[in-house]
Amino acid sequence: MSRSLTSQDHRALADRIKAAETRTRGEIYCVVARNSDGYFFPAAFMLAAGVFLASLAVGFWLDRSWFVVGHLAFVLCQAAALAAALLVLRAVPGLAIRLTPRGLRYRRAHDNAMRQFLAHNVHLTEKRTGVLIFVSLAERYATVVADAAIDDKVQQQEWDAIVARLVAAAKAERLTEGLADAIDKAGGLLAQHFPGGVSNPNELDDHVVEI
């Protein structure tokens, strides 16, 4: 996925949010995270499990070959192998997330999205019409989190379609374009159900936050 947004990207997306919100009482907020976790401990668990299974295989082979190794030496070899694996895990950027199961990566990214929804007060708009568009780049994950009033009106499959287009664009190194499209589509859905009126206060900042 694309790794960062330029200052020009930020200005363009802020203008896109402002334009989308002129048609609706809804509020759109965007957060782009580099990652949602360091994943060292899940990856370390996977490595430990791998060392354990490899040790079983080696132990079985030694037993079949009648090759004698003392218990202490065998345990020390296991410990050395695990220590070396953990050092490599620390030293190689991006290795931890590759060793972490996809389901766990997505859960961590989703949890981060919910934290950002609350941290940026998207849930505190007057009419409960806030929407968070969230992307976590390392996990290749995106989601739309909608507040209660919107959730009652907009079907989940409509958000899913927006997310699918956003993820596809980000994977193709077109993150800015994908976010702009998601903002436009979200604004269109909000305008259908929560059209702007005479009183249309801007309750959330119109910009993209990178964390």
What name fits each language-model region?
Residues 1-2, 6, 36-41, 66-69:
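Alpha-helical transmembrane cores and adjacent cytosolic helix/loop segments
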Residues 2-28:
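Short, charged cytosolic
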Residues 40-51:
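Select subsegments of transmembrane alpha-helices in polytopic membrane proteins
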